[in-house]
């Protein structure tokens, strides 16, 4: 979740993953 978002929601903490 949060794939392609620069927010700390889920397992994506990058700028644009």
UniProtKB/Swiss-Prot annotation:
One of its GO terms (molecular function) is neuropeptide hormone activity. Keywords: Amidation, Neuropeptide, Secreted. Its main location: secreted. One of its GO terms (cellular component) is extracellular region. GO terms for biological process: neuropeptide signaling pathway. The modification Leucine amide is found at residue 17. The keyword Secreted applies. It is found in: Secreted. Myoactive. Belongs to the pyrokinin family. This is Pyrokinin-5.
């Amino acid at each position: 979740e949060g794939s392609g978002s620069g927010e700390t929601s889920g397992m994506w903490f990058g700028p644009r993953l």
